[in-house]
Amino acid sequence: MRLNSIVPDFKADSTKGPIEFYDWQGDSWVLLFSHPSDFTPVCTTELGRIAVNATQFVKRNTKCLAHSVDDTQSHINWVNDIKSYCADIRGEFPFPILADPNRQLAITLGMIDEEKREDIESAKTVRALFIISPDHRVRLSMFYPMTTGRNVNEILRCIDSLQLTDRLKTVATPANWMPGSKVMILPSVTDEEAAKLFPKGFDKTSMPSGGNYVRTTENY
């Protein structure tokens, strides 16, 4: 799935019953992410850390939706291991895990490793991740190999950046940005416009080229 492409509506079984994606999403953002296989070490840590941070996603109006090619009963059994390993998960496991044993959704969303596509019936998904806005568009995607687990803080940071720049369409977030730190004013915004948009001020950095394109503000 390319950025800004629309995720098609789909139906699938999950640990929380059948899901019709568009109805389930409602007006929320969605973190849709795949893992290679249940009952494996890195996947256990990933789903565990996302579950531990469930309230952080709720604060961002973001629903989490896990996915693999295992069946529903496998997911249900595995959840007990995740909760045991991550002892700080309280109560019911906070998000559904989609079952995709026929790999239909995995193929549609391009989650299968290119080297595994010839043996699709036994292929596992890579660690694919999509942040989907309420209009069903893919706003950000990440693809990690099976050997590398994902960073939950980076996922949250990306959601914060997307939601901020949707709200303030004249700014972008720089490298290593964190909520509350400086944002960059887009080059398409003139200094005069920036002064009106950010009346508390903004900073300009002189560049050797003479360009006036590095402007930052904390007042947003």
Feature locations, PLM:
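Chalcogenol-based redox active-site neighborhoods
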Residues: 1-220
